[in-house]
Amino acid sequence: MLTIALSKGRILDDTLPLLAEAGIVPTENPDKSRKLIIPTTQDDVRLLIVRATDVPTYVEHGAADLGVAGKDVLMEYGGQGLYEPLDLQIAQCKLMTAGVVGAAEPKGRLRVATKFVNVAKRYYAEQGRQVDIIKLYGSMELAPLINLADKIIDVVDTGNTLRANGLEPQELIATISSRLVVNKASMKMQHARIQSLIDTLRQAVESRHRG
């Protein structure tokens, strides 16, 4: 049995057509079903519906053989027990710093609000910059407006939400897209099956971008 961990939303919507190219189609609509384990048209493949930030955990610990997660989630997770064999080139965006439009660069310690705490620590450590990281789970744009933080680090798609709140994107940390991740033990135990799926998905990604 192959178990694939996915999260609802944009990643799920963009991944299902790629899986369909490999003949893997859920027997129920994951967006409408309350089930968290969903069978597919292939008897030996099932989908797990989990939180986006939990996908790498399920895969690394072997609760799922494969998963699809954003590069931002994988960078923050930083686990060692999984392979990342394929960039699916879906759910593309940017991980960036942002601050109030026209604001002067703060002197001294920088206050940064983000849910990407590990990414932020690594990023500013590489710059040799002293920072105070403030962990938030949402509404990052609010932090600079009420002087909770000088800057934020967040995923930016169009930038409209930033601009609507008087902020502007500043430094690019990483270009983000969703990646296929594979449990290391599963790759050894079910190598032929998983490699075949990887190859099929790679062809689907390439044909989509050629077309």
From Swiss-Prot:
First-tier enzyme category under EC: transferase
Major place of residence: cytoplasm
GO biological process: L-histidine biosynthetic process
MF terms in GO: ATP binding; ATP phosphoribosyltransferase activity
Pathway named in the protein's UniProt entry: Amino-acid biosynthesis; L-histidine biosynthesis; L-histidine from 5-phospho-alpha-D-ribose 1-diphosphate: step 1/9
GO cellular component, one term: cytoplasm
InterPro entries: ATP_PRibTrfase_cat (IPR013820), ATP_PRibTrfase_CS (IPR018198), ATP_PRibTrfase_HisG (IPR001348), ATP_PRibTrfase_HisG_short (IPR024893)
EC numbers: 2.4.2.17
Coiled coil stretches, renumbered: none
SUPFAM superfamilies (alphabetical): Periplasmic binding protein-like II (SSF53850)
Keywords annotated in UniProt: Amino-acid biosynthesis, ATP-binding, Cytoplasm, Glycosyltransferase, Histidine biosynthesis, Nucleotide-binding, Transferase
Function: Catalyzes the condensation of ATP and 5-phosphoribose 1-diphosphate to form N'-(5'-phosphoribosyl)-ATP (PR-ATP). Has a crucial role in the pathway because the rate of histidine biosynthesis seems to be controlled primarily by regulation of HisG enzymatic activity.
NCBIfam families with a match to the protein in the record: hisG
Protein family (similarity comment): Belongs to the ATP phosphoribosyltransferase family. Short subfamily.
Subunit organization: Heteromultimer composed of HisG and HisZ subunits.
Comment block on domains: Lacks the C-terminal regulatory region which is replaced by HisZ.
PANTHER family linked to this entry: ATP PHOSPHORIBOSYLTRANSFERASE (PTHR21403:SF8), ATP PHOSPHORIBOSYLTRANSFERASE ATP-PRTASE (PTHR21403)
Protein name as it appears in the record: ATP phosphoribosyltransferase
Lineage: Bacteria, Pseudomonadati, Pseudomonadota, Gammaproteobacteria, Pseudomonadales
Gene: hisG
